[in-house]
Amino acid sequence: MRELEERILKDGRVLPGEVLKVDGFLNHQVDPDLMFAMGTEFAHLFQDAGVTKILTVESSGIAPAVMAGLAMHVPVVFARKHKSVTLIDDLYTAEVYSYTKKTSNHISIAKKFLQADDQVLLIDDFLANGQAVQGMFEICDKAHVKIAGVGIVIEKVFQTGHQLIADRGVRLESLAQITSFDGDRVHFASEDTQA
């Protein structure tokens, strides 16, 4: 998605450890117009997948997931990282390691929000090593739902997450695919297709 790539080049910042900081429009301050465009693009990409529900992990996956849900007219469920006093129902849980925060979290979803006949689209802000997606796969497996696909805002194709999804035979659509960082320069897969 060219608009997203341009925004990454304009406002993103490469940090040590191959971390891309995009807090100016995605995961701290949110640009609603860009989010709407991303949600619309996800809806277009998965229009024939029979999606009945969207699943994400709090918190940075919520905005793109909600915009996709709005465009697709389906509910959005987000896995909570911290158990609240209101989260008392039977739960599906999984452990997820955060690449950027270097911590593990238990994510939880109330069982009543995932039914065996659901076709679930997983959406997240980043795909690096695939730990958040792996946690969502685990929850979907426990709920016996069909995974319609995975939608990622920004994918680092040089890390292991892509292969993790491919090994499951699940369709993956990423709006921006980063092939490498060169100092503070970001290189996209779309550059290779334009050459």
From Swiss-Prot:
It is an enzyme of class 2 (transferase). One of its GO terms (biological process) is XMP salvage. Xanthine binds at L20, N27, K156. It is found in: Cytoplasm. Pathway: Purine metabolism; XMP biosynthesis via salvage pathway; XMP from xanthine: step 1/1. GO terms for molecular function: xanthine phosphoribosyltransferase activity. It comes from the Bacteria. Keywords: Cytoplasm, Glycosyltransferase, Purine salvage, Transferase. One of its GO terms (cellular component) is cytoplasm. The keyword Transferase applies. Belongs to the purine/pyrimidine phosphoribosyltransferase family. Xpt subfamily. HAMAP family: XPRTase. NCBIfam families: PRK09219.1, XPRTase. Homodimer. This is Xanthine phosphoribosyltransferase. It comes from Lactiplantibacillus plantarum (strain ATCC BAA-793 / NCIMB 8826 / WCFS1). The gene is xpt.
